[in-house]
Amino acid sequence: MPKRGKKYLEAAKLVDRFKAYPIAEAIELVKKTNIAKFDATVEVAFRLGVDPKKADQQIRGAVVLPHGTGKVQRVLVFAKGEKAKEAEAAGADYVGDTEYINKIQQGWFDFDVVVATPDMMGEVGKLGRILGPKGLMPNPKTGTVTFDVAKAVQEIKAGKVEYRVDKAGNIHVPIGKVSFDNEKLAENFTTIYEAILKAKPAAAKGTYVKNVTITSTMGPGIKVDPSTVAVAQ
């Protein structure tokens, strides 16, 4: 394990590692234990009872957080003609076709999200080995392969986040910054929690949400009691 600094150890003393806190209390603790000198990101980690090795237990999707993440997302759109104009009008940072494919192949990555129209995927597919490992490959499940490029760009700019289960059965999602009001962080948390509950694979057996932890960029993890979260039925 990496050696922890004095500030981290002092912050960690405020947290009972064996307790799952009500969401409101957990958010308050995230702020108290934040040791970063910058406006740290608040992230939630879900440990799920799924086997990601099985195709019918993969979880991937996207949801628009009501208060965004506090980060301005740079959006690259692969589109032509009218669709390119729509993407530009919606606020995309970069819009084009083959010229951006060449740039990426040469090591350009000044973007955070990639959107593509379906007719461009034949060309964009050439970037699979480059974009895939970085989690940047457009995908219909996350709404980033679509002809409605304007809606896709607007949602991303408004605070849309993607979630995807990793090989260990975990999902990590940013829900804002420590500077956010507690209520806004709680509402963002509830939104992503509801999305993950709805995404439960039919093949998943036993306890689905095993563990929920919330943390700031450099702070200690704080367990959350999911039963304290009011979710829509």
Curated annotation (Swiss-Prot):
NCBIfam families: rplA_bact. Belongs to the universal ribosomal protein uL1 family. GO terms for biological process: regulation of translation; translation. Coiled coil: none annotated. Pfam families: Ribosomal_L1 (PF00687). Binds directly to 23S rRNA. The L1 stalk is quite mobile in the ribosome, and is involved in E site tRNA release. Protein L1 is also a translational repressor protein, it controls the translation of the L11 operon by binding to its mRNA. One of its GO terms (molecular function) is tRNA binding. This is Large ribosomal subunit protein uL1. It comes from Geobacillus sp. (strain WCH70). Keywords: Repressor, Ribonucleoprotein, Ribosomal protein, RNA-binding, rRNA-binding, Translation regulation, tRNA-binding. Part of the 50S ribosomal subunit. InterPro entries: Ribosom_uL1_bac-type, Ribosomal_uL1, Ribosomal_uL1-like, Ribosomal_uL1/biogenesis, Ribosomal_uL1_3-a/b-sand, Ribosomal_uL1_CS. GO terms for cellular component: large ribosomal subunit. CDD domains: Ribosomal_L1. It comes from the Bacteria.
